[in-house]
Amino acid sequence: METQRASLCLGRWSLWLLLLALVVPSASAQALSYREAVLRAVDRLNEQSSEANLYRLLELDQPPKADEDPGTPKPVSFTVKETVCPRPTRQPPELCDFKENGRVKQCVGTVTLDQIKDPLDITCNEVQGVRGGGLCYCRRRFCVCVGRG
């Protein structure tokens, strides 16, 4: 009788633990990868933009050193380029081709890898053209300019 009662109690605890595991998502399921967090920032940029076309990730700088806390803001630097897709279409930017001679923006700021917390602090500035119709790409304090003339 005592063994049967202990078995029933153990069964209930197992059921409770299983239900708890299903209801409470794990921390790893809530954490985004560095790239996913940046893509989310690009989506936010497109949502808040008043420009005609969507922007798509062109280049992503290396992620910062590993930090175990997904809620801690992480520095980010990336480049986006204008696509051929009009903003009102709501098409995923990853499916859009880059626009020939489209605008290029360098973006810096911070993101978190936590899906629940959503603080993004990103500033994007258009990469300025140079004489002859070329472009300058600046990364931190180093710029490379490619001109046509």
From Swiss-Prot:
Disulfide pairings: 85-96, 107-124, 136-145, 138-143
GO biological process, any: antimicrobial humoral immune response mediated by antimicrobial peptide
Database matches in SUPFAM superfamilies: Cystatin/monellin (SSF54403)
Main location: secreted
Chain residues in the propeptide: 30-130
InterPro entries: Cathelicidin-like (IPR001894), Cathelicidin_CS (IPR018216), Cystatin_sf (IPR046350)
Pfam families cross-referenced by the UniProt entry: Cathelicidins (PF00666)
Region feature Disordered, mapped onto this chain: 61-80
Locations listed in the record: Secreted
UniProt keyword terms in alphabetical order: Amidation, Antibiotic, Antimicrobial, Disulfide bond, Secreted, Signal
GO molecular function: lipopolysaccharide binding
GO cellular component: extracellular space
Residues modified as Arginine amide: 148
Domain of life: Eukaryota
Signal peptide segment: 1-29
Role description: Microbicidal activity. Active against E.coli, Listeria monocytogenes and C.albicans, in vitro.
Entry's family note: Belongs to the cathelicidin family.
Protein name: Protegrin-3
Gene symbol of the encoding locus: NPG3
